């Protein structure tokens, strides 16, 4: 496990290092309902944040609240001396799963090594015993890389879906972590975790002055203009704000439409160049041109701003109108992956079709990005070469 960042007093409490103490939950699910659930996709929520921020406390809280969910917990790595390491091998169906621990209420804990795919695939062999997965990452993990694996593996995608990314920020050390400078101009881990989040929990607010919480909140909002920000103590939060968000699927289309109308553009704080930009362009987009627009941002990484700095998109989200399609289409991009999916919402005949996009990233220029997007809508390609060229790929 990677070492904690910061001083010794940032270490996790002992309770933070151990697997959550789980209590038995009554279930009234019938055998028929359980069988029918075997074919249903299971949501996965990624919980991320620096060591000591309160990730395991949140897990503990979720698992001991009354919500009638049967939850499987995936721990990215077991901490040294963790109580889990005392009993990692369990017998299931005559086979030995060395990395799995089945707890007394039927919930599961496991250690995810390498890219985590094998562990999750093994977990899916136990499908029917749980209906929700919580995945806790290490403190320095990039949640974008973790989220990407749910899109890359088609077989895995038939069993599960990514529901949302929750980032927990320590009220006392959050500003310090967000301001940390990395070599070669890289984005630090804390900033990337905040930028990718669907919900950000500012935790331990009772341990710092209110003014410090306000500064931290403003900094977080400057990085992520779309995610919900919640202030918590001991990671206690209304579970409807962190579970069943449907942040990455077509069911989020209706709520996303309202949310995108009120997303503010942001300015960088703490000398960071991470911002949220949003724009709207009326009309229809040709799907192949829209793919070209997104691929140049996420794959080719050859789009530059007015200062000739590379634009780096960390997360992309929006609702678009695709030519010859009656349904609104949601676009999602994380890391170097993206997806277009039709929503259940149709465009009304008496309303103007439009495209709303929100991009979170570094060195983003709203005017240039909007200009490039307009090229996909108007189907004119003369503007495309203005700010990206094949011989100017960002490295």
From Swiss-Prot:
Its EC number is 3.6.5.-. Residues 274-377 form the CobW C-terminal domain. Its main location: nucleus. A motif (psi-PxLVp motif) lies at residues 17-24. Residues 1-36 are annotated as: Disordered. Keywords: Chaperone, GTP-binding, Hydrolase, Metal-binding, Nucleotide-binding, Nucleus, Zinc. One of its GO terms (cellular component) is nucleus. The keyword Chloroplast does not apply. It catalyses: GTP + H2O = GDP + phosphate + H(+). A motif (CXCC motif) lies at residues 107-110. Coiled coil: none annotated. It is an enzyme of class 3 (hydrolase). Residues 8-20 have a biased composition (Acidic residues). GTP binds at residues 49-56, 110-114, 203-206. It is found in: Nucleus. Zn(2+) binds at residues 107, 109-110. One of its GO terms (molecular function) is hydrolase activity. Zinc chaperone that directly transfers zinc cofactor to target metalloproteins, thereby activating them. Catalyzes zinc insertion into the active site of methionine aminopeptidase METAP1, which function to cleave the initiator methionine from polypeptides during or after protein translation. Mechanistically, the N-terminal psi-PxLVp motif binds to the C6H2-type zinc finger of inactive form of METAP1. Belongs to the SIMIBI class G3E GTPase family. ZNG1 subfamily. This is Zinc-regulated GTPase metalloprotein activator 1B.
């Amino acid at each position: 496990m990677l070492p904690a960042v910061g001083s010794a007093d940032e270490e996790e409490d002992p309770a933070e290092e151990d697997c959550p103490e789980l209590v038995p939950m009554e279930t009234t699910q019938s055998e028929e309902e359980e069988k029918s659930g075997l074919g249903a996709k299971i949501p996965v929520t990624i919980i991320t944040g620096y060591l000591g921020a309160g990730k395991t406390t949140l897990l503990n809280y979720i698992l001991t609240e009354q919500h009638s969910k049967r939850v499987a917990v995936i721990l990215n790595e077991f901490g040294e001396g963790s109580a889990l390491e005392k009993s990692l091998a369990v017998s299931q169906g005559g086979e030995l799963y060395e990395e799995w621990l089945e707890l007394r209420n039927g919930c599961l804990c496991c250690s995810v090594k390498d890219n985590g795919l094998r562990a999750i695939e093994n977990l899916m062999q136990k499908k029917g015993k749980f209906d929700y997965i919580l995945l806790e990452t290490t403190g320095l993990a990039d949640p974008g890389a973790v989220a990407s694996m749910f899109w890359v593996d088609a077989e895995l995608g038939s069993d599960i879906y990514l529901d949302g990314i929750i980032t927990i920020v320590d009220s006392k050390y959050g500003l310090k972590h967000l301001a940390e400078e990395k070599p070669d101009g890289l984005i630090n881990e804390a900033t990337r975790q905040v930028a990718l989040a669907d919900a950000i929990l500012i935790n331990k607010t009772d341990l710092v002055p209110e003014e410090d919480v306000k500064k931290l909140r403003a900094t977080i909002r400057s990085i992520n203009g779309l995610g919900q920000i919640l202030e918590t103590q001991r990671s206690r939060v209304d579970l409807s704000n962190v579970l069943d968000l449907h942040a990455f699927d077509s069911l989020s289309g209706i709520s996303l439409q309202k949310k995108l109308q009120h997303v503010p553009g942001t300015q960088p704080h703490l000398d960071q160049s991470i911002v949220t930009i949003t724009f709207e362009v009326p009309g229809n987009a040709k799907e192949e041109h829209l793919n070209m627009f997104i691929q140049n941002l996420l794959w080719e990484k050859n789009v530059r701003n007015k200062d000739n700095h590379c634009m780096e998109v960390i997360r992309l989200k929006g609702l678009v109108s695709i030519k010859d399609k009656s349904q609104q289409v949601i676009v999602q991009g994380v890391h170097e992956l993206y997806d277009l999916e039709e929503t259940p919402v149709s465009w009304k005949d008496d309303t103007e079709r439009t495209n709303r996009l929100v991009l979170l990233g570094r060195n983003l220029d709203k005017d240039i990005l909007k200009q490039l997007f307009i090229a996909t809508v108007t189907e004119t390609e003369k503007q495309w070469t203005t700010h990206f060229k094949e011989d100017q790929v960002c490295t």
